[in-house]
């Protein structure tokens, strides 16, 4: 049994968001611009910066024990790994990305079958080949080094498979989405032998739990206040909460303390109602984790 867990931090667009998420979960990761080996304030962790496109193969080989990458790249490499959990976050939003089949706006193509014999361009070559092969649709799939949208506009290919969140860039280039091929979110993946190691599995599960709790706390705040005891029922009815607000009696008083967790955006509309119902000493505080 090893007392060191080798963790792959995704280099690139997810890098800063991942480091911030670890900080909220309780780990401080320090990354130097001249090093691929980040420092971390945990003697049991050894972090490495790895491109998400390659994370799956290194986890599968056991070069690293666990890492975070988009599910799209795990599927692209057909990696034989354990998917520990989803980690729905990105540098922009918390929505999944979509890999979509795209053609020119004036194309006659309405479904994947209409592309039989066509040439497609994409970064996701392996997945795209398997997708069409499974449906017995003969196509040629070429790797794209970038500017993929321009290739179908310039007639360099018949269609593309491209990643998008909203589809706005695709529409702006006078292109049309035929259908979605895959939805992807960041996932934590583990090497199968590492997952079977009791110490490593417990460490991985601890990290996953705390990272997910930090994600759950995003946009949430705690609200605490005092109120007359006879107003407690009315106040708790207007307070949203995961289960029910916490109500406790103040020492030697007929007043109570009320505490609840709610979405930060709800505070501005709820506080005036709380004041009208007799609440006093209202305190709003940030949350790092919800477990």
UniProtKB/Swiss-Prot annotation:
UniProt-listed SUPFAM superfamilies: GlnB-like, Periplasmic binding protein-like II
Mechanisms controlling activity: Feedback inhibited by histidine.
Keyword entries, A-Z: Amino-acid biosynthesis, ATP-binding, Cytoplasm, Glycosyltransferase, Histidine biosynthesis, Magnesium, Metal-binding, Nucleotide-binding, Transferase
Pathway, per record: Amino-acid biosynthesis; L-histidine biosynthesis; L-histidine from 5-phospho-alpha-D-ribose 1-diphosphate: step 1/9
Domain of life the protein comes from: Bacteria
UniProt-recorded Gene Ontology molecular function terms: ATP binding; ATP phosphoribosyltransferase activity; magnesium ion binding
GO biological process, one term: L-histidine biosynthetic process
Reaction(s) the record says it catalyses: 1-(5-phospho-beta-D-ribosyl)-ATP + diphosphate = 5-phospho-alpha-D-ribose 1-diphosphate + ATP
GO terms under cellular component: cytoplasm
Pfam families (UniProt xref): HisG, HisG_C
EC number of this enzyme: 2.4.2.17
Major localization listed first in the record, in broad terms: cytoplasm
InterPro entries: ATP-PRT_HisG_long, ATP_PRibTrfase_cat, ATP_PRibTrfase_HisG, HisG_C, N-reg_PII-like_a/b, N-reg_PII/ATP_PRibTrfase_C
Cofactor: Mg(2+)
Cellular localization per UniProt: Cytoplasm
Gene3D superfamilies reported for this sequence: 3.30.70.120, Periplasmic binding protein-like II
Family recorded in the similarity comment: Belongs to the ATP phosphoribosyltransferase family. Long subfamily.
Function: Catalyzes the condensation of ATP and 5-phosphoribose 1-diphosphate to form N'-(5'-phosphoribosyl)-ATP (PR-ATP). Has a crucial role in the pathway because the rate of histidine biosynthesis seems to be controlled primarily by regulation of HisG enzymatic activity.
UniProt-recorded name of the protein: ATP phosphoribosyltransferase
